[in-house]
Amino acid sequence: MAYKEYRDKVLHFIEEHEKWRSHTINLIASENITSPSVNRAVASGFMHKYAEGWPRQRYYQGCKYVDEVELIGVELFTKLFKSDYADLRPISGTNANQAVFFGLGQPGDKVIVLHTSHGGHISHMPFGAAGMRGLEVHTWPFDNESFNIDVDKAEKMIRELEPKIVVFGGSLFPFPHPVKELAPVAKEVGAFVVYDAAHVLGLIAGGEFQDPLREGADIMTASTHKTFPGPQGGVILYKKFADDETIAKLQWAIFPGVLSNHHLHHMAGKVITAAEMLEYGEAYAKQIVKNAKALAEALAEEGFKVIGEDQGYTKSHQVIVDVSDLHPAGGGWAAPLLEEAGIILNKNLLPWDPLEKVNEPSGLRIGVQEMTRVGMMEDEMKEIAHFMKRVLLDKEDPKKVRKDVYYFRLEYQKVYYSFDYGLPMKE
C-alpha cells in the first residue's frame, strides 16, 4: 500500500468519527465539545510554536504573540475563578496534579485522597502521580449513604495522620465535598488543601456546585475539557497560600519539572473558552445542573436505580445509576448495549464495588454537559431516559433504537454558550 493511502485512511477515520459523534448522544462525563472559535485556535499556527517559561521571560525567541495570548489567559482565568494566580501551562489535569504533588510533597509525605471506588482519580493513587512522587497514600473515610466523605471520621484521620496534602475532588462527583468543614482541620496540622476540579471546573466558573478557593482550598487543579468546555489541557489556580519560596517550588515543578513546552494551540483555546465562560458560564452551568437533575428524575421514573435520591440525585453534571440488578456484569453489560443504540457513556465502579470488578462494575456514570452545550434542555433529558429504558429495561433491539437516536440528535448540531451561536432559544 502506498504511504499516501495511510494518510487517506487516517483522514477517512477522522471524518467518520466526526460524522458518527455528531449523531450520537454523548454522555461521557469527562468530555465536551468546543466552539468553532476554539477550534480555530487549536488548528492555528500556534501548534508549531515552542515556548518555555513565563510570558516575556522565555527561553525561545519569537514568542511575542504567544505571550500576549497567555497574558490574556492569566487575566481571564484569575477573574473567572477569583484566584491570585492562574497557570495555564499544564497539558492535562493529571499533569497539573503531578506538578502539585512534586512541588509540595516529598517522598514519604502523607496524602489523603478518595479511594478509586469512591471516585478518586487515578492520578491520586499509589499507582498514579501521587505514588510516583513517593507519597504515602491514604484514602478518605466514605459514607455510602450520603455518597460523600464522612466528615467526623475524616477529621479524626487528619489529626491522627498529620498529612502534608489533602485532596478533595474526583471522577465520580455528584455532590460537593466538605471543603469548608475539613480545610480548617487540615490547616491545623500544616497540610496543603488541594481541590481537583477537573470534572466541575465549568460549574464552579458558572457559580454552581461549590467555590473551593473561598471554602478553604489553597490550590485548585483541573482539566479544561469537561464541564469547562475547552480543548484538552489543564490549569492550576491558587491563592497566595504560602510563602514565596513554597509557591516558587510549585511553579518550578510545573516548568521545568513536569513539562517544557505547553502546547500553545491548546493554551489559546483555553483562553477563548475562559472568555466564553465569563460571558455565558453562569447560564451554561445552571442549565447543566437542571439537565442532570431532570435526567436523574426521568431515569428513576422509568424504573432505573439512580443513586442519591435523598439528596435530589445530583448537584453536578453527573448522574450515577446502579445497574447491577439488571445483569451480573452490571455496567460492563449496559454500556456496550447503549453504545449500539448511539448512547455513549461509561461503566463505573460504585463505592461498594471491589476493585476486581473494574470491568464489570455496578454502575453507569452519565454526564450531561455536552448535550447541554448543543442546546438540549429538561424535556430532551426525558427523551434520553426513555431511549435508555427501551434498551436496558425493555430489551428492545439497540439497532432499532439507534435509528430514533440518530434523528433525535440531528436537531442539535450547534455549539451554544459561545460567541459563535450565543444562547440556545427555548421553544
From Swiss-Prot:
It is an enzyme of class 2 (transferase). GO terms for molecular function: glycine hydroxymethyltransferase activity; pyridoxal phosphate binding. GO terms for biological process: glycine biosynthetic process from serine; tetrahydrofolate interconversion. Its EC number is 2.1.2.-. Keywords: Amino-acid biosynthesis, Cytoplasm, One-carbon metabolism, Pyridoxal phosphate, Transferase. The record marks 225 as: Plays an important role in substrate specificity. One of its GO terms (cellular component) is cytoplasm. Pathway: Amino-acid biosynthesis; glycine biosynthesis; glycine from L-serine: step 1/1. The modification N6-(pyridoxal phosphate)lysine is found at residue 226. (6S)-5,6,7,8-tetrahydrofolate binds at residues 120-122. The keyword Plastid does not apply. Its cofactor is pyridoxal 5'-phosphate. Transmembrane segments: none annotated. It is found in: Cytoplasm. InterPro entries: PyrdxlP-dep_Trfase, PyrdxlP-dep_Trfase_major, PyrdxlP-dep_Trfase_small, Ser_HO-MeTrfase, Ser_HO-MeTrfase-like, Ser_HO-MeTrfase_PLP_BS, SHMT-like_dom. Catalyzes the reversible interconversion of serine and glycine with a modified folate serving as the one-carbon carrier. Also exhibits a pteridine-independent aldolase activity toward beta-hydroxyamino acids, producing glycine and aldehydes, via a retro-aldol mechanism. Belongs to the SHMT family. Homodimer. This is Serine hydroxymethyltransferase.
